Design a protein with these regions (language model features):
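Phosphate- and other anionic-substrate recognition elements at nucleic-acid/protein interfaces
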Residues: 3, 7-8, 13-137
């Protein structure tokens, strides 16, 4: 499960059982995120959480990291048997927006920030899976 953590809302993405294709799952209001993840994990198999690392171009942490790090700590404590992979999330929102344009979504649909968060999480998860799969080939 990929988590594009945001202060207000968080995009989530998951993969198929053989880990080939990442798919947008939903956008959750961040205050409800932890409850949503616990309920999801109770009914679906999740062995890895992929969480973005928010950095500036000079590799320094962005302001978002002050919110992301406490969440990652909470996730680690609640799910000690699950892997937490950290990935660079720079440009994922821009890539998500471009994906929406390329797919022909109307301007009104592209303004839906929740969709951008879901697509950004999907991009993070697909990149992570591509990296893992290339490592094992």
């Amino acid at each position: 499960m990929a988590i594009d953590y945001g202060k207000v809302r968080t995009g989530l993405a998951v993969t198929d059982p053989v880990r080939i294709i990442a798919t947008a799952l939903t956008t959750v209001a961040t205050p409800n995120l932890f409850t949503y993840i616990k309920e999801y994990c109770a009914r679906e198999e999740v062995d890895t959480f992929v969480v973005g690392i928010a950095k500036h171009m000079d590799n320094s942490p962005s302001e978002s990291m002050q919110y992301i790090e406490p969440f990652v700590k909470q996730l680690t404590e609640a799910f000690p048997n699950k892997e937490i992979a950290r990935v660079d999330e720079r440009f994922t929102s821009k890539m998500a927006f471009q994906t929406m344009i390329d797919s022909g979504l109307k301007k009104k649909q592209r303004r839906e920030k929740g969709m951008i968060d879901q697509i950004a999480a999907t991009i993070m998860l697909q990149d992570y899976m591509n990296t893992i799969n290339n490592r094992t080939i």
